[in-house]
Structures are given as structure tokens and as C-alpha cells.
Amino acid sequence: LAGCEYTTVYKGKEEQLPYGYEEKIKEDDTYAMYRSGSSLPFSYVYDSYMDKEDYDKLSVTEKQQAALQVCVVDKDEELTGLNEASESVKYTDQEIPYEVESSKDVKVLEDGFKVSRNGGSITLKFDGLDESETYLIVEDMDYQSEKQELEEAAAVNLNIEYENNKKTIHYMTDKNNFYCGVKDFLVNMGYHRGGGKEMTISFQKAGTYTFSDFRIVCQPVKDFSEMTAACKQNGLSDVTFEGNSMTGMITNEESQMLCITIPYCEGWTAYVDGEETNL
């Protein structure tokens, strides 16, 4: 959605590449750069929309799918000629059931895990989907240290390993000087042609870890190319930048919404054929 055509990874860590980044462009002793043939361009269009109130009710994985199919707008926007498509958005993500295999250092609780030793771990056993990205999603995370010292309770890591891909959740408690209230995490463990069978999670520090939700979700990618192709059907041409403005040309036979991948901030004004329009 942000129009990122290129990405880099450490050499030898290609399993961390997001789906679609397959063409190696260049490399040095440390990094390799890859290009995606499915990335969206600098600008693209939508011909349907979803009300933001409906969008906010979706799960995190549903939101990323919706954003590829419809434009999200506030309810009070006047959108003549566009389709309201909240009911027709296609969702293919699947929550995957799992069994917990814990070590002697981890006790499974109803809402989390009690870890008695630094580095204690659990293994989640499940049947992952083929041709999918696999996510670990945790919500409303909380950590209570076994010790009372401030430094022991300020931050903690969860180290996750799945199919040779390693990721880390760095969680800061409200005792951390850099605490910012983040308690929900989605960890993308990568795209795999064949579904994996287990995910190992190790807890850096002893203590009690609780969550309101702790789940595995697989996101099939078979419809991804079709969705991006629909967005690419139209967009700006002859784009020029000058000072704090940009211009471009677009021709469309029916009403569409144009998305330009410039991060939004207050102060922008848009004109279509010389007439000011809504942003």
C-alpha cells in the first residue's frame, strides 16, 4: 500500500523477505536488495469504499485485506458514483488452532504463561496453511516480574522461531522510561510455500505473561496479485515535483478515488482540473 518496490535483508536471511520480493537487484558483503513485481505504484485508484466506522471493527488481518480492495473514508464524505463495498470485501485469513507444548519452566495459565526461569520456552504445534504468510498475534500483553527491582520489570523480550525465521517482540512495561502504551503485536513470521508445523517462543525473563488474545493466523496469498492488479488499473502519469507541490495527469471514464503514497499531514490542498477537491 505504501508503494515499496524494494526491500533489503541481511545476506543469508532471505526467509525474512515479505511475500513477493523475489528478484535480487544487488548485494554487498552484508545486505541483499530485492524487488517486488506486485508492489503498488506511486499512485493508484479505488472504485469502491468502506466507511471508517466499519473498518475500525475489523481484526488487524482483515484490515490489511480490506485496504487492498476498498478505500476507507469517513462517513460524512460525499462520494458520488462510487460503490459502498463493506459487505463485499473478501477475507481469506484463517485462525489456526494449536496445542501448547511447554517445558518444565513454563506453566500454562488460562490467560497466559507463568515462567519460572529466564529463557523458559513453549512450542505451539499446528498445521499451517500452504502458500501463506503466518502471523503470531498477541493483544493486551502484560508482564509482571518475579522480582521487584525496577530494571527487572521495565522491559522484556519474546523470541519467536518458525521455519528458520526468527523475530522478537520487545515489550516495555509502564515502568520503562520509553513506555508508549503498546500492548498489541502482530509478528509476521514470513511466507512459506508449505505450511509449517511448530513455532517456538522463548521468554527472556522469568515472570507472568498475560494476554487477552494469543493466536496464530495464516494469510493465503493466492488473491494478492489480483487485488494489486485492480488497484494498478489507473493512476497518475507525467508526475512532476516542484517546491512543496506535485502535479500529475489522470484520465478515468468513471468515478474513482486516487491514492497517492505521500504520508498525509495537515496543510495539503488538492485540485482537480483547477478546482479544489476533498482530501
Model regions: which residues?
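Active-site-proximal, structured, solvent-exposed surfaces of multi-pass membrane proteins
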Residues: I96-L279
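A cross-kingdom signal targeting lumenal/periplasmic-facing segments of multi-pass membrane
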Residues: L1-K104, G112, S116, T123-D127, ...
